[in-house]
Amino acid sequence: MKKLTIISLALGLLMNTEAAVAQESVIQSTALKLPVGTFANMKRTTFDPTKHGFKFSNEFQTQIQIAGLNGPRFGGLCGGMVYSALDYYKTNEPIPAQTHRPASGTTLHQYILTRQNNSTLLNSNGGSNADKWAELILNPFGWRTNEFFNWGLQGSNGGRVQELVEMMRSGSPVPLGLFKDGNGGVGPHHQVLAIGYDLGRYKGDLGDYKEDFKIFIYDPNYPNQTMTLRVNPAAQNYYYQERPDNKWLTYFVDKKYTVARPPAISSTPLANDGLVRQLLIEIGTGGDDLRGGNDNVNVIVKYTDGSTDIYPTVNKRVRWMDNYKESVLLSLRRAAPLGQIKCVMLQTTFGGGIGGDNWNVDLLRIVAKSSDQERVVFAQTGSPLVRFDGNNRPFEAVLR
């Protein structure tokens, strides 16, 4: 697992959302500065959130561990999802079709995590957005609040409107950083993808018709939707037309993005025979985590004829942190009618007690997938539903 730097994770804490790099090419902004009133009034790229965006929401959580102890925890990998979606788009690769958030340790999760690191600090071209965030955070007594807000409306002298227009001339979407004021500058901030803009009657001159200005957004917090970033000059904020409670003081144009080759994640259509071919298993860890390493969990699928299939180490030897849900998609080795699948069992591999591991499972939900339907076949919760304490007795979920 490629580890994030402590500095990058610290930036991740500031951007807590209400959620191997190769073949690189740098997006270059046009060197020629555009005089006020000469840029294109509107621009839409071909990026469509329903086609090019992820189908799952940005509900990730990540926790720093220091000397084996659980440290700070932050939510959301918005920058990683934005960079990754743009990678798939620019390399003409199909974005993964899965609707569930990828579990910790999976190929897609690791890639998004790496791209989160790139988006905040350590980009592969040596660039960094740390200076952008730091400048906005350092605003004692709000002395620069008006200035920061106006940057988002300036169409000249390096203003954000000018940067956005110049970078979108080529038809490429552009990542944005959204800065939320207050709370001592610690956010929650956000990262999104600008996929178009419309100036309306606004000229980029800080004059009339500021309210006309719109930026069309792919936001990983809102899959399959196009959000519209609008301006409220009286309140000095930028907000979503569709969700006015989402608002920020200002934004910046991310000119440090470099494209990378994303992983190919297969999604073969299920055979049209009505048989259950996949099980989506959602496991909510309670107040005691699954350690990973040598302490893991296996899934056993048992059929009515007495046969079983074992899927070992479904957590991929990665820690599943407390009070967090992970999802595992099993492609069954033996497709079968639902009535022939008797139960699904969770079996741990560790010893309990001092020096061992204990694991609380508060939620277990199982969805059976065939070509024509998805059906919830087990759903139970508890506090905990089951505690694995080293006796290695499996928990049996009888399907309905």
Briefly describe each language-model feature range.
Residues 185-189, 198-277:
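Cys-His-centered catalytic/binding microenvironment captured across papain-like cysteine peptidases
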Residues 45-157:
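Cysteine-nucleophile protease catalytic domains, especially the papain-like/related folds used
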Residues 273-400:
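Regulatory, non-catalytic segments
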Residues 1-4:
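Positively charged n-region of N-terminal signal peptides that target proteins for export
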Residues 168-177, 212-216, 342-345:
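Short, hydrophobic/aromatic-rich segments at coil-to-beta transitions
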